[in-house]
């Protein structure tokens, strides 16, 4: 369900309404400075740190030996050379899953930017980015990344936030693993446990978000900020069990309906919509953007708005430059956090200094 009801609010009028919607405006480096260096590599994270991002984002999945791995998907096919290194380890569906490999095995893989596979040919998703397979990046664990960030903070005397997305908890439950519990335990080990700490935990899985809020945070004596990421139902992002115990596609339609954001607000501090969910594309043009009803719904629910994902390569027709896109999101939709592959441009737009 994409846009079940329609309310139009134009930027000039809405700017006054959103003044209290967001606190400090912040930039999250989505998978690091992924527009410049392969996503989720240490090089990508250190570049984003230097560029002045407020937070570094991590996608977290589990290995066969229960180690948290930083990777953009629980499927290895289109980000590593797994098909060459372990050609017989795919499942019946033809995919190679992180959870079927140990940390030692995963360390043997070369990591690169996301790509499409046609036969034996690899085509980058974003053709003008860092060349595929050069110079030979590797996957790493979530704990290694936390240690890396702590090291940067120690040597520079400058802090940066952690923005951790728990990937497909439902899939990990199917595999008999509790990725949410392991993620929270590791965050607490490194001192990320209260609302005053520089940390957000995000997931698409609303059922798991409720479990984190009701069960896991009290269990670990934690109170970190939670973000519900929003998807369209036809993206097939999440599964849940029906009344017969069968796993079925999760229906996100209610999040786009009246009262949806109020329901989310019972468990989350904010929501993470795609920017396309906030703007009526067919009715928008340069200098005149029409906002979707989700914008006012988020404000009415007093939720933080964390918008995904701004990229040079995917700017809409109504935003000619990255600055125009940041302006629309921060000043018209009322977003207080924008996730981007180009954190330096977001930092510059907000008038914040780079760290180096």
Swiss-Prot record:
Molecular function per GO: glycerophosphodiester phosphodiesterase activity
Primary site of residence: membrane
Post-translational modification: Palmitoylated upon expression of a fusion protein with first 40 residues fused to PhoA in E.coli.
Topology within the bilayer: Lipid-anchor
One GO CC term, this protein: periplasmic space
Residue ranges of every copy of the GP-PDE domain listed in the record: 25-314
Intracellular or extracellular location(s): Cell inner membrane
EC number: 3.1.4.46
Application notes: Immunization of rabbits with this protein partially protects against subsequent intradermal challenge, suggesting it may be a viable vaccine candidate. Recognized by sera from 39/43 syphilis patients, it shows promise as a diagnostic antigen.
Main function: Glycerophosphoryl diester phosphodiesterase hydrolyzes deacylated phospholipids to G3P and the corresponding alcohols. Binds human IgA, IgD and the Fc portion of IgG but not IgM, which may contribute to evasion of the human immune system.
Protein's name in the database: Glycerophosphodiester phosphodiesterase
Organism encoding this protein: Treponema pallidum (strain Nichols)
